[in-house]
Amino acid sequence: MLVWLAEHLVKYYSGFNVFSYLTFRAIVSLLTALFISLWMGPRMIARLQKLSFGQVVRNDGPESHFSKRGTPTMGGIMILTAIVISVLLWAYPSNPYVWCVLVVLIGYGIIGFVDDYRKVVRKDTKGLIARWKYFWMSVIALGVAFALYLVGKDTPATQLVVPFFKDVMPQLGLFYILLSYFVIVGTGNAVNLTDGLDGLAIMPTVFVAAGFALVAWATGNMNFANYLHIPYLRHAGELVIVCTAIVGAGLGFLWFNTYPAQVFMGDVGSLALGGALGIIAVLLRQEFLLVIMGGVFVVETLSVILQVGSFKLRGQRIFRMAPIHHHYELKGWPEPRVIVRFWIISLMLVLIGLATLKVR
């Protein structure tokens, strides 16, 4: 929005030309989202407390979590608000990739909001019925994937980028829709599963978004894309603005979500952020890179799948509790230790993922 305004004002004052620089807009996008999130935090927490929108804690969870009962939840609303406002201010409104991310972000946020509302208002620990949650998540993911396929059919936008192999970029055809669906829905659920400890999900989300900001910048720059042997996508550059907005909003939220948390993001935050990371990976053609950089989310999800599968097939559990962060809690690790170690692992995986772009 401000970019368009600056384009009209630059003829009166050349200084407005700074708004055309992607790096400048990326920085101010981060700062805008950060300040909005910090400003909204105390007000959102007070409002949630007044409405008695407190966290519902399962009785079969770790005993250390019982003290979290009643902590305000649905704080993801302030994350999404900060991201959307920042993106609308600093990204080019005509960019289709930006709107794809916003559709998934807001759509998944609405699904998460309904889920949270049922939990905190109706006191239903199960929230939105699973089949309806997956149905609406699938509708959004398939709708966006199908639209992208129609527009990008038989172009680099529907190729599969394989790490370590610079000349292996097969056209996916209709499989593009299926892959995109699983990436978007899967990442949404993976971040949702990871959001079980104070600050555990938000910091890896920030790390991955920061990593994708660098990838988006390279993908939208023809020279760097050719140098790294990745597809050049002319709309990809504006995703830098989206990614830095996620970073800023996430850091602002972490101010209030760090241990001991004053507020939880709820499904309205975790589903939306996960879906956003998924669609960003799809748009950048970096689904494999998401698996590497988002390794913490992958492991958390696999721990649940293995736990459920093992119990159904053998009647035995592999972990003391799943997702795996609860396993370490029950082993006696203090919650802050689990959180920070997972953060360290996440940062390492993002750096490893970025390194794979050059190792080809």
UniProtKB/Swiss-Prot annotation:
* Enzyme Commission number(s) of this protein: 2.7.8.13
Its cellular-component GO annotations read: plasma membrane
Stretches assigned to the Periplasmic side: 1-25, 93, 153-167, 220-235, 284-287, 359-360
> Which UniProt keywords are given for this protein, alphabetically ordered?
Cell cycle, Cell division, Cell inner membrane, Cell membrane, Cell shape, Cell wall biogenesis/degradation, Magnesium, Membrane, Metal-binding, Peptidoglycan synthesis, Transferase, Transmembrane, Transmembrane helix
Q: How does it sit in the membrane?
A: Multi-pass membrane protein
Query: What HAMAP family does the record point to?
Result: MraY (MF_00038)
Question: What's the name of the protein?
Answer: Phospho-N-acetylmuramoyl-pentapeptide-transferase
Source organism per entry reads: Salmonella arizonae (strain ATCC BAA-731 / CDC346-86 / RSK2980)
